Amino acid sequence: MSIHISSKFEEAMKELENIVAELESGNVPLERSVELFNKGKELHKYCDKVIKEISLHIESVDPDDKELSAKFSDD
């Protein structure tokens, strides 16, 4: 996993946190709320993809580490 992807992931997470905070404030017009929601869905999809890729990488490095694999499972 390259540093470029890591920094992009961190930026996406921060933007997602900002979107959640803005939506939770309750002071957002409906149209803006829909825009933020859609952007949040895109960011969530990207972050979830990165996390799954990292999980697969970790499992490939040490596939016998059941404890480590369990921490990254969807259960």
From Swiss-Prot:
The protein, known as: Exodeoxyribonuclease 7 small subunit
Keyword Cell cycle: no
Keywords: Cytoplasm, Exonuclease, Hydrolase, Nuclease
Cross-referenced NCBIfam families: xseB
Broad class of where this protein is predominantly found: cytoplasm
Subunit structure: Heterooligomer composed of large and small subunits.
Pfam family, one: Exonuc_VII_S
UniProt cross-references to InterPro entries, sorted A to Z: Exonuc_VII_S (IPR003761), Exonuc_VII_ssu_sf (IPR037004)
Gene: xseB
Family the entry assigns: Belongs to the XseB family.
Functional note: Bidirectionally degrades single-stranded DNA into large acid-insoluble oligonucleotides, which are then degraded further into small acid-soluble oligonucleotides.
Keyword Nuclease belongs to the record: yes
EC number: 3.1.11.6
EC supergroup of this enzyme: hydrolase
GO molecular function per UniProt: exodeoxyribonuclease VII activity
A Gene Ontology cellular-component term: cytosol
GO BP annotation list: DNA catabolic process
Domain of life: Bacteria
Reactions accelerated catalytically: Exonucleolytic cleavage in either 5'- to 3'- or 3'- to 5'-direction to yield nucleoside 5'-phosphates
Location relative to the cell: Cytoplasm
Species this chain originates from: Anaplasma phagocytophilum (strain HZ)
